[in-house]
Amino acid sequence: MRHYEIVLLVHPDQSEQVPAMLERYKTLVTAANGKVHRVEDWGRFQLAYMINKLAKAHYLCLNIECSKETLAEIETGFRFNDAVLRHLTVKRDKAETGPSAVMKRVEKEEARKSSQQETAA
């Protein structure tokens, strides 16, 4: 089995469906004897350029271990899901389990915002 990192850009109006989407993709991987090593919800970010007349998207990151057939099935699901604006799959040498650089930045910004709210109150 191979290790993959998948980054998804989801339509911002479909943000409430993100947990269900993640659960569906995790179920696909585990049903095919694969493993899910890391799932990160990075939140909404500004896009570098407009995609389908949208300036923002909801970002997700999955690190999985599965066969290439399972990956093909997952990517086919991305293509037929209108909520997925873009996806990128990268083959990794080993499983990534720690927080990604983007997730560290998101957590740092959330901590900064909460400390500012505490000092303002």
UniProtKB/Swiss-Prot annotation:
Compositional bias segments (type: Basic and acidic residues): 104-115
Alphabetized GO MF terms: small ribosomal subunit rRNA binding; structural constituent of ribosome
InterPro entries in the record: Ribosomal_bS6, Ribosomal_bS6_sf, Ribosomal_S6_plastid/chlpt, Transl_elong_EF1B/ribsomal_bS6
Keyword rRNA-binding: yes
Region (Disordered): 94-121
Protein's organism: Leptothrix cholodnii (strain ATCC 51168 / LMG 8142 / SP-6)
Record flagged with keyword ATP-binding: no
Gene3D superfamilies, per the entry: 3.30.70.60
Domain of life assignment: Bacteria
Alphabetized Pfam families for the sequence: Ribosomal_S6 (PF01250)
Protein name: Small ribosomal subunit protein bS6
BP GO terms, sorted: translation
Gene Ontology CC terms, in alphabetical order: cytosolic small ribosomal subunit
Family as reported in the entry's similarity comment: Belongs to the bacterial ribosomal protein bS6 family.
Stored NCBIfam families: S6 (TIGR00166)
Physiological role: Binds together with bS18 to 16S ribosomal RNA.
